[in-house]
Amino acid sequence: MKKRLLTLSFLLVIGSYANTCFAWGKVGHELVAQIAFRLLDDSTQKIVKGYLGNLSIEEAANWMDDERGNSYYNYMRTWHYLDIDKGQNYEPSSERNILTVLHSAITDLRMYKEIRRKEVKRDLLLIFHLVGDLHQPLHTGYAIDKGGNTIEVTSPSVSGNLHSVWDTQIIDAKGINLDSCMAYHNSLNPADVLAFEKINELKWMYQSRSLLDTVYSFQNNFLDQAYLDNNAKVIKRQLVIAGIRLASILKDTFGPKTNG
């Protein structure tokens, strides 16, 4: 019997701090999934949809957040984020966080022909969501403010905690949608797209984390119009890059070259 070296069997995980954020919110996660599917061939789309069963790609992308109210899944609370003190680097550990879970899910999914369909579906649900989470900079942020959740801000058009502003409010206020995201995607240099497609979760995390100075570039807890305008562009870019990378994972696993 083959032993699976990496598995994501749903084991109880004990965490001392559970981040309360919902990266990108419902719309943002839907956009990541929709962008990814626009970049897949019909055959790969069909395979992925087959494993998702009765779930749409939008529902798959939001599943981890939708289940937050279900105590059965409390062990997943720490899987959405990673906290690193400012100026420090990530220290690999056995703890279940966004990096370790995403890496395990991607590795697990590559064995999809050898594992049960429900396990493939589980891996897809994790990957669809966590790729999105990883590209929200505050999910790779600082424990001191709980990824921006404890910082209250105001602005001409949005207000609340900094994390919620980045999750949903700028997306809603600026009307970021699939058409605008695909227009941005189509404007990218093909060489940049190829670079984005390389699967390396650690590099993805550091790229998101490099945006934290931009996230915190305000004074007196006030976000002026320039902040909102500039960071709407950053958010759109992050959503598109997340979609490109989700598509890359799916193509790498289920694409024609893999299966033919």
Predicted regions and their residues:
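Structured alpha-helical
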Residues: 1
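Sec-dependent N-terminal signal peptides
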Residues: 4-16
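N-terminal, motif-rich segments that launch catalysis or mediate targeting to/interaction with membranes
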Residues: 20-130, 140-260
